[in-house]
């Protein structure tokens, strides 16, 4: 796996699923391929994205700044600085300075990532802030190692939280989660179907599914009524893809 592929993987792991994630993935690909060279416009675009947490925006802004060539005098962006200040906690800043001193002696991506993984996400974000604000300089490889370690820490806590929700025995939460997943799947089907003539059937199925979820929420249904909703939709989507000559593995 190449270095940039690894960075893209880690960064995307902390972005919530949805159309915005696909858009961010495309921007990262363009940036890493050297196709997007307007850092100013890229940062403005990032700043106005909804849904993303300030820290996720800060990490993405840091990655874009590391990768896109820019004039030396280009202003640092406030939204990135604020996100990478470790919540203003002096404890985080002390640890960030110690980590920075270690990273300065490191030259490899994996070495930097290994060192960084023993620090908290707050200290890692503060260390990124030091580098972003030009208070310290490390090689791009080392900076990317720091980014990936931070993303791994965040993704770990997100995964724990997700696992708790999936494993919950509360039928109401499970019911709502199944309806949310069905609704999201229907939305994705509509986007994939596009405007081809054969898409009408897939669009119809997706539309009916969304209406059904709305009705279930409006009238309040038994928690078990949502079982299998998403799987039914995915089967319809695969049948549609087969007719279109597209062979894909199951999405589950």
From Swiss-Prot:
A GO MF term: RNA binding
Gene from which this protein is expressed: M
Region (RNP-binding): 165-252
Subunit: Homodimer and homomultimer. Interacts with NEP. Binds ribonucleocapsid by both interacting with genomic RNA and NP protein. May interact with HA and NA. Cannot bind NP without genomic RNA.
HAMAP family documented for this protein: INFV_M1
Entry's Gene Ontology cellular component terms: host cell nucleus; membrane; virion membrane
Descriptive protein name: Matrix protein 1
Organism of this sequence: Influenza A virus (strain A/Swine/Colorado/1/1977 H3N2)
Note: Most abundant protein in virion. When expressed alone can form virus-like particles in transfected cells.
Motif Nuclear localization signal, residue range(s) on this chain: 101-105
Membrane topology: Peripheral membrane protein
Similarity annotation: Belongs to the influenza viruses Matrix protein M1 family.
Region entry Membrane-binding, spans: 1-164
Alphabetical keyword list: Host nucleus, Membrane, RNA-binding, Viral matrix protein, Virion
């Amino acid at each position: 796996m190449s270095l940039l592929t690894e960075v893209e993987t880690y960064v995307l792991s902390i972005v919530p699923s949805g159309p915005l994630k696909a858009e961010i993935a495309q921007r990262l690909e363009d940036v890493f391929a050297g196709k997007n060279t307007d850092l100013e416009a890229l940062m403005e675009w990032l700043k106005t994205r909804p849904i993303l947490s300030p820290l996720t925006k800060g990490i993405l802004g840091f990655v874009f700044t590391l990768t896109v060539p820019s004039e030396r005098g280009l202003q640092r962006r406030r939204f990135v600085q604020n996100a990478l200040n470790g919540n203003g906690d002096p404890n985080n800043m002390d640890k960030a300075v110690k980590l920075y001193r270690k990273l300065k002696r490191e030259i490899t991506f994996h070495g930097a990532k290994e060192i960084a993984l023993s620090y908290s996400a707050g200290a890692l974000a503060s260390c990124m802030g030091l580098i972003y604000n030009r208070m310290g300089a490390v090689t791009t490889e080392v900076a990317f190692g720091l980014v990936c370690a931070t993303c791994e820490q965040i993704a770990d806590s997100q995964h724990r939280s997700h696992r708790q929700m999936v494993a919950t025995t509360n039928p109401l939460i499970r019911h709502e989660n199944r309806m949310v997943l069905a609704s999201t799947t229907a939305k994705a089907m509509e986007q994939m179907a596009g405007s081809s003539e054969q898409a009408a059937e897939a669009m119809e199925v997706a539309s009916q599914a969304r209406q059904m979820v709305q009705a279930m929420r409006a009238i309040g249904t038994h928690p078990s009524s949502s079982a299998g909703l998403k799987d039914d939709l995915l089967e319809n989507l695969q049948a549609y893809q087969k007719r279109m000559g597209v062979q894909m593995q199951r999405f589950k």
